[in-house]
């Protein structure tokens, strides 16, 4: 998926698989320059076709790498609508200089690769990634372990380029009963793509509008129709709408993320450096927490960490929402504190897990490290679960139009860091009743500002009375200073979900409302380096 902001964009089967001849172009190498090869291989056909699809790549062989001096390789994937990196970029240079090979590839449907994008279906794009792994393993200058077709292999990339990492690792386990990835470094990606794009069946219509616009020619036609429907209506394409569009999105997205693999009983025993944007309004922090908590085995989690930074997918013009008032800042104090910056931390993580360099020590493994909303400090946690309950009683909000409610939860100084939620008995008078919930900070309801610019919906498709509901709020890290207060924001409208208000007038009434807050009483110590 695409980060559409002013910052640098992330958008942007054995080797019997035939390589397409005549496309290789090796750059002259010197003592300090890598050898760069551009080529394509053939992968599985598109659904309904028998013609193989070409997947194109750029392979960087670092200076000095040879069969006598083999080196690890790091795969790189681009974001939605982007293409592979063909030159020595600032991201690549430190790794190449340190003796890592790199393979960057055009994901199916993008760049020079053929086919259409299927949002990383395991039975389509999963095979693309595995054939690239086979290609890497066939290079004589690549270090092997556990067999000649098992390269020492890492992976990096963000958004769609983070999704392929989980896809490839799980596909290797599913189809080959193997685990050839040795370290992953996914950024701003998803656990459950359907839940990310349409939490509680409420389509992120503003994002779907942009995602549709940047991929009209590249996307699977069914997904394209469903994205356009969600952008126009604010509803997820299921039921009768899915039949009319010939696009059952529940079934389509079922196998496109880690959640499905975990539900099938699979986990990854791979050290993983997870990085997610706390103010990412497409794939919020919750997606990364679910990946960290459920996708990794306990052993892998003890060798991994989650970094929450202030950044990610930011809507153009909506970095600070107007309705309700929201704010976000940029910064990554956790990567700075733990490794001297994200690129340096990632390289250290690869050095430790790919080069097996025991001299590299990394503090904070097995923990969550979250940037506060002002990006001034890093909160380290052993758990992101709620610790404190605040009872609010009855809360009533209109569902078509109305001013946001700001309900006081507590006074500063206090720190809230982790995964809050709202539990209540919900009554909805009309169909498709919706409201949006988040945390806010201010001196009063009049100036309360939504933390990390993040809200999540509650959507009742049919009228109901007194049904138990839990609303998962966006993951947060916020210091509430003395003189300010923490509020629960409840609003019938939010500009990030345009056109998503309820269709019929009425109200949502929440009784016995309890807000579960992850209050951090004292700073948690960073786990010792190891």
Predicted stretch roles:
Residues 268, 274-276:
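Short beta-strand/loop motif that positions the catalytic acidic residue
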Residues 63-70, 118-124, 131-159, 175:
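Gly/Ser-rich "nucleophile elbow"/oxyanion-hole loop immediately N-terminal to the catalytic nucleophile
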Residues 97, 126, 138, 145-146, ...:
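Accessory cap/linker subdomain of secreted extracellular hydrolases
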Residues 284-294:
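Short alpha-helix in the alpha/beta-hydrolase fold that links the catalytic acid
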Residues 65-71, 76-114, 281-284:
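Short substrate-entry loop that stabilizes the transition state in hydrolases
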Residues 34-47, 355-530:
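Glycine/threonine-rich phosphate-binding loop and adjacent beta-strand/alpha-helix elements that clamp
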Residues 1-31:
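Secretory targeting and sorting signals
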Residues 32-69:
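N-terminal cap/lid segment of alpha/beta-hydrolase-fold proteins
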